[in-house]
Amino acid sequence: ETAELNMSYENVAIDYIDHVAILKLNAPEVLNALSPNMVQELSSAITDIIRSDARCLLITGEGRAFCAGANLQPKGAADGLPPAGSVLETHYHPVMTKLRNMEIPMVSAVNGPAVGVGMSFAVMADIVVAARSAYFLQAFANIGLVPDGGATHLLPRIIGWRRAVELSMLAERLPAETALDWGLVNRVVDDDKLMEEALGLAARLANGPRSLGL
């Protein structure tokens, strides 16, 4: 049984299939780059999911990208915006913490590029399934920034300090197959099989004991 799509958001969408909540980044025209408005919607959507009877969260992106990173200056934004670091601290990082602290398992279906903070969103999940065409990128070094969104905490713990430094300092694309070899993702599947695989895993977790989410 599938619930109706939640239409109260502009930049994210929530759907429910049985006890699996599907949270989709829904701004394909900007490759699902996370604007402050989208992050606010994400926070509200996560609250909705926490209040629901969902037993597992599946997160993915609409269109050809999972998430192109943080869009700190969305189109039409006025001058005089606060510094990027301040925006990250007040908008982005609290949502990352909120996701991380959810008491249900999380699966990510990485349908395309996962860049910058979008990479952190992808790999913070308990189970990460990537499309074969997907890639991961920490591009901060190219613009003189340190990795954000929890990457400096997550990456060394998942793939080890040496490879985390390589990703951060060289800012090279990491193809899905290499990410699998490195232990960054759990499974790589053909693009047209991604949601089937991810939903199958999410349903399995949703039907498991609640202790899986703790």
Each language-model region and where it sits:
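Glycine- (often His-adjacent) and acidic-residue-rich active-site loop
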Residues: 51, 61-98, 114, 142-144
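Crotonase-fold acyl-CoA enzyme core
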Residues: 97-211
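Short, hydrophobic secondary-structure boundary micro-motifs
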Residues: 33, 68, 213-214
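Conserved CoA-thioester-binding segment of acyl-CoA-metabolizing enzymes
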Residues: 2-62, 97
